[in-house]
Amino acid sequence: MANSNPKLLVTQNPFSVFLLTFLLLITNVKSDSFSFNFPKFDTDTKSIIIDGDANTTNGVLQLTKKDQLGNPSPHSFGLSFFLGAIHLSDKQSGKVADFTTEFSFVVNPKGSQLHGDGFTFFIASLDYEFPEKSSDGGFLGLFDKESAFNTSQNSIVAVEFDSFRNEWDPQIAGNSPHIGIDINTIRSSATALWPIDRVPEGSIGKAHISYNPASKKLTALVTYLNGPVIEETAVSYTVDFAAILPEYVLVGFSGATGELAETHDILSWSFTSNL
């Protein structure tokens, strides 16, 4: 079992690709079995990079900006990821890691019936170029208008928690929020309804995301406890990680608001992989 222990690294400007790649390579996860667990986030949290509007406050990782009253700010985007290059696959042996990640989160519209835009859990190449601007709104902090649909340019897989339907999103049920699996583009390959509007405002959601290399199945399960009722949804998609992503990757979160806003708070996060 391996782990990495640099201090929390906070930036005000997007990373240089060369600097980021260097930092990640010197903190490579060498072990075939790897895990980390963050029961909360604060300034003493190790091995986490935050960038853009992301911040840590009172043990919570806030992906997008809030005002002094805790209300969400429009046109905000931020990201956070683990400072360590995760060994996802081995070309020589042909092996691909299985992994499981779990996190608890709150997306709160603060009284607004219409809200947006959402957040993602992502797995990306070490040299993935996160946009320096124009990645708010429906681009969810991962893409801009130039990269959002250019599948040959990107090397990223994401599970999106999308609370506002844009023109590229599927019409599952009107403008209902949805979760989706994105492969190198903001246009989801598979989607399912996200029951955020059916639970009380401020409810804690729990996400369980896993990958099975034998079946090449990526699965995301989201659960809310709504009194005696369990609100649950799941989405899965077959994807060959070895064909989409390099041997070493980074894992993390992004979030964004547009004209409409909501909070995007990660309360806890764990990750386990076995190659």
Curated annotation (Swiss-Prot):
The lineage's top-level taxon is Eukaryota
Molecular function terms in GO for this entry?
Answer: carbohydrate binding
Q: What is this protein's expression induced by?
A: Accumulates in roots during colonization by arbuscular mycorrhizal (AM) fungi (e.g. Glomus intraradices).
Task: Please give the residues the UniProt entry marks as glycosylated.
Answer: 55, 150
List keywords of the entry alphabetically. Answer: Glycoprotein, Lectin, Signal
One of the GO biological process terms = response to symbiotic fungus
Q: Which residues form the signal peptide?
A: 1-31
Annotated family: Belongs to the leguminous lectin family.
Biological role stated in the UniProt entry? May be involved in arbuscular mycorrhizal (AM) symbiosis with AM fungi.
Q: What is this protein called?
A: Lectin 8
Q: Which organism is it from?
A: Medicago truncatula
